[in-house]
Structures are given as structure tokens and as C-alpha cells.
Amino acid sequence: MGVMAMLMLPLLLLGISGLLFIYQEVSRLWSKSAVQNKVVVITDAISGLGKECARVFHTGGARLVLCGKNWERLENLYDALISVADPSKQTFTPKLVLLDLSDISCVPDVAKEVLDCYGCVDILINNASVKVKGPAHKISLELDKKIMDANYFGPITLTKALLPNMISRRTGQIVLVNNIQGKFGIPFRTTYAASKHAALGFFDCLRAEVEEYDVVISTVSPTFIRSYHVYPEQGNWEASIWKFFFRKLTYGVHPVEVAEEVMRTVRRKKQEVFMANPIPKAAVYVRTFFPEFFFAVVACGVKEKLNVPEEG
């Protein structure tokens, strides 16, 4: 029996490996077929994540509308996509559109341009985001408004402009690439966290409103999207619980990982996705069920960072 088991084990492992390979290939092909011929609008396509989303959806055969506020960088992205396109597979030439979401006045015209060109939008990926970090009392109200325009008013203005077309056709999907700070705030990121809370609240409400029209609202929330070559600095991060938490939080996820998750979200029509390791995920639940403990840990971390002495 022992000899037979030893002989069967390699065959079993080989069989499992084969099944996993088949599953991965089927999933990959299914992902591509889910966006084939679909009109997909990607905002801030010239960012790290925007480029990766453009690559994934272009390979999948989508009719891309790439939005960005720098024409030269849009053209560079266009050239990169065309140069790596597989001639044996059906792909479409992307449409380039200048769009700065912080300038809300131009958003309706951009939406009209896209609808006039294609007649519809099947998938909108709200990817644009502007970050700011600093003590709340040192951030000007003007900067607060700028961040809210880019991260909240811009995306919802574009969404509102394209949504009637989706409702009338009774089909469509809107993906908000948000941030885990839409669930809980981190010190010195008050304005950014506020904009992410606002965006998440809007799309959570919208999800229920448009469900009867078969329009899907999805949110993808990573800890943060790191650049291609930036990694956390080494340091004495193990000194306390809060430092361990923030150390885990700062690793973030790579743009390639997020782009692939956005594709899976579109394919499976997921409603909410968190991309984080267990520590930040646990923090979401701690914030919900044990808020006083959560606030105490975060406040303790701020005091240590600023070297503020304890009272008494």
C-alpha cells in the first residue's frame, strides 16, 4: 500500500497542476471575452494604474477611451499599446481624450464627445486620484476644494453624465478605484480620506438606485497603489502595535495587481473588493466594532511620531 501511495502521489500532483492550469487559462480567456467589443472609459489613464488597466483591457479586445490631462503622455501610452498588440487577436485603436477631472466644467463636454463617437459606454473606470498629506490645520481650504474636485466631484460628474445612457440601455458597469481610507481615516490625510469617504458613500448609494436597471456599481479599494520601484523605508517599525499596523499598511499593492483585480471585478460583476493584507483588513472591522480601541491605538501612534509627552 505504501509503495502504491508513493507511485500515485506524483500522478495526483500532476493531475492537480493540470487542472489548475486549465482553470487559469479558462479564467484568462473568460476575462478577455467579458470586455471584447465593449466601450471602456479609463480616467487618468497615464497614471501607473491607468496604464496597466489600459494594457489589460486593450489586450482583452475593449474599445478604449483613454482620458488624461497630458496629451504627450497619452500619445506615448497609445504608441506603447499599439506596439505590443498581438496581430493575431482582435484589438481596437484607443481613442484619446484630454480630461482633467479637477476642472469639472469640461467633464460634460468630454462625456458628450465619447457618446457621440461610440453611441454608448459599457464600462467606466473612475481611476483618477490626487493625494495630499499634512496636518489638517496647515492644509488650506483652497487645497481642500481642489482635492474634493479631483477625487469626488470630478468622478461623480462624469458618472452622472454617462449614467443616463447606461440606464436607457439597461446595461453597464461603473468601477470606482478608491482606497481603504474610504473606510477609515489615517492621521495627516484628512482631506484625502474625506474625499475617499465621500466617493465611497456616493457609489454605495448609487448601487442600490441603479440595480433595477442592471447597472453594476463596483468599488475596488487597495491600501494604496505603490509606484513601480518604491518600497517602504527600513526602520524600527516593530516598536509598537500602531507602528506594526502602519508598516503593514504602507506596503500597498502593485499597479499590475490592481489592474488584474479590476478586470476580475468587471468579469464577475463584484460589488466591493478590498485589496490589503490581513492587518489593514482587520483594522476595518476593529474600527467598526471597537471604535474606541481603534482611535486610542491611532492616537498613540501620532503621539509617538510627534514625540508628544503623555499628560500626568
UniProtKB/Swiss-Prot annotation:
One of its GO terms (molecular function) is oxidoreductase activity, acting on the CH-OH group of donors, NAD or NADP as acceptor. PROSITE patterns: ADH_SHORT. Keywords: Membrane, NAD, NADP, Oxidoreductase, Sarcoplasmic reticulum, Signal. Residues 1-18 form the signal peptide. One of its GO terms (biological process) is D-glucose import. The active site is at Y192. NAD(+) binds at S47, L49, Y192, K196, S227. Its EC number is 1.1.1.105. The keyword NAD applies. SUPFAM superfamilies: NAD(P)-binding Rossmann-fold domains. Its main location: membrane. GO terms for cellular component: longitudinal sarcoplasmic reticulum; sarcoplasmic reticulum membrane. It catalyses: all-trans-retinol + NAD(+) = all-trans-retinal + NADH + H(+). InterPro entries: NAD(P)-bd_dom_sf, Sc_DH/Rdtase_CS, SDR_fam, SDR_family_member_7C. The keyword Cell membrane does not apply. Pfam families: adh_short. The N-terminus region encompasses a short hydrophobic sequence bound to the sarcoplasmic reticulum membrane, whereas the C-terminus catalytic domain faces the myoplasm. Belongs to the short-chain dehydrogenases/reductases (SDR) family. NADH-dependent oxidoreductase which catalyzes the oxidation of all-trans-retinol to all-trans-retinal. Plays a role in the regulation of cardiac and skeletal muscle metabolic functions. Maintains Ca(2+) intracellular homeostasis by repressing Ca(2+) release from the sarcoplasmic reticulum (SR) in myotubes, possibly through local alternations in NAD/NADH or retinol/retinal. Also plays a role in Ca(2+) homeostasis by controlling Ca(2+) overload in the cytosol and the SR in myotubes. This is Dehydrogenase/reductase SDR family member 7C. It comes from Homo sapiens (Human).
